[in-house]
């Protein structure tokens, strides 16, 4: 089970709702993924205007927990305003804090992310900050009282997978809240690797929506995450420099 604040989820896959070719593909991919948490950018929708396109209009949202994110924010104050807008519309008061500090890499601004998280915690939000793989920053966010840490595997939408597994593993080892690997996942193998490292979940979007067959990829990601989690719980064998025979040598007859 994945526990975030007061919520408990069976699925460890969190799925973004953007960039799908059409609403029908989006809906089918979400259903196949069995994700229970759907994230979306508040700025991409006019959530107070029923006449405007709505990324969630073809989804039976009562079956899901919605995770609005503050994508587009460049400052802590902007992030807080976006989060409050989502909450005022009646959406879940759980929010993914995203404050971008660089337009080319889309890497998060560590100072503004820390500030926004603190402000939103004071407002009573359930806070899930998207951050880099900075181990110290992850610890400082945890000390603030955030409800989960969301370190990026690599830049958003890059599909590079986990470029710094050592830092991700350090973040996981020191964590007392769930660690959800976010951004840069490109394949089921990437998702499985994140889970093998001990992550509590994986959030992805482009890897599914940008695939040749998003529906098949959604299922593949679900299975990859499940396999990776089972592997982590089972415990992999230790790496060794030399071979170890898998068949016992004792009792073997010697052929003259």
From Swiss-Prot:
Record's keyword annotation contains Phosphoprotein: no
UniProt source species: Bacillus cytotoxicus (strain DSM 22905 / CIP 110041 / 391-98 / NVH 391-98)
Compartment(s) where it occurs, according to its Swiss-Prot or TrEMBL record: Cytoplasm
Protein's name according to its UniProt entry: Thiazole synthase
Keyword Hydrolase: no
Gene Ontology CC: cytoplasm
Gene: thiG
Documented EC number(s): 2.8.1.10
Pathway the protein takes part in: Cofactor biosynthesis; thiamine diphosphate biosynthesis
GO-annotated molecular function: thiazole synthase activity
Enzyme class: transferase
Pfam family, one: ThiG
Signal sequence region: none
GO terms (BP aspect): thiamine diphosphate biosynthetic process
SUPFAM superfamilies: ThiG-like
Binding site for 1-deoxy-D-xylulose 5-phosphate: 157, 183-184, 205-206
Entry annotation: catalytic residues: 96 (schiff-base intermediate with dxp)
Catalytic activity: [ThiS sulfur-carrier protein]-C-terminal-Gly-aminoethanethioate + 2-iminoacetate + 1-deoxy-D-xylulose 5-phosphate = [ThiS sulfur-carrier protein]-C-terminal Gly-Gly + 2-[(2R,5Z)-2-carboxy-4-methylthiazol-5(2H)-ylidene]ethyl phosphate + 2 H2O + H(+)
Family: Belongs to the ThiG family.
Function: Catalyzes the rearrangement of 1-deoxy-D-xylulose 5-phosphate (DXP) to produce the thiazole phosphate moiety of thiamine. Sulfur is provided by the thiocarboxylate moiety of the carrier protein ThiS. In vitro, sulfur can be provided by H(2)S.
Primary localisation category: cytoplasm
Keyword annotations from UniProtKB, A to Z: Cytoplasm, Schiff base, Thiamine biosynthesis, Transferase
Summary of subunit composition and partner proteins: Homotetramer. Forms heterodimers with either ThiH or ThiS.
